[in-house]
Amino acid sequence: MERVCVIGAGPSGITALKNILDQHLEAVAYDFNSDVGGNWIYSENESHSSVFETTHIISSKTLSQYEDFTFDDFEPDIPDYPSHDQLRRYFQAYAAKFNLYPHIEFNTLVKHCVRENDKTWKVTVEKDGIEKTETFTHLVV
């Protein structure tokens, strides 16, 4: 059975996860944050790479939206250049719409990934001080 590891549940990670699941493959995404959004989750914590509190995207929502879940599907009244918080909520709504949350392990640090001789990946993660190593056939970073 093919088993896929996706590192990160930001904008790219959730679309990768959705498309992998659409192919009926087993998949899990690991993310250091407590929710979907990646760098679009604003935080003053210096250990988290995030947008500035006043950030808005520089491309229009029309050019930045997902084809299978548009901003009009989410919130039609969002301005053409959404704020970081509107984007964060959009990404979280995308994950909810496509039932991605059960496939994401949050508050989880990916410590290292090793390609084995049998062409599998050993991925070691840490959550709440406990390490575990999982084996995957594919790795998406």
Please place each PLM-identified region on the residue numbering:
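N-terminal Rossmann-like FAD-binding beta1-loop-alpha1 element of flavoenzymes
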Residues: 2-29
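Core residues of folded domains in eukaryotic genome-function proteins
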Residues: 2-3, 23-25, 32, 36-38, ...
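Structural signal for hydrophobic/aromatic residues that build the beta-strand cores
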Residues: 4-7, 30, 40, 66, ...
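Structured beta-strand/turn binding interfaces of compact recognition modules in eukaryotic regulators
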Residues: 10, 30-33, 43, 107, ...
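Surface-exposed, flexible loop/turn segments at secondary-structure boundaries
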Residues: 12, 35, 48, 112, ...
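N-terminal, helix-rich and Lys/Arg-enriched segments in bacterial and organellar proteins
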Residues: 12, 19, 40, 94-95
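Glycine-rich active-site loop/strand segments that organize a redox cofactor
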Residues: 32-93
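Feature captures the FAD/FMN-dependent oxidoreductase FAD-binding
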Residues: 77-141
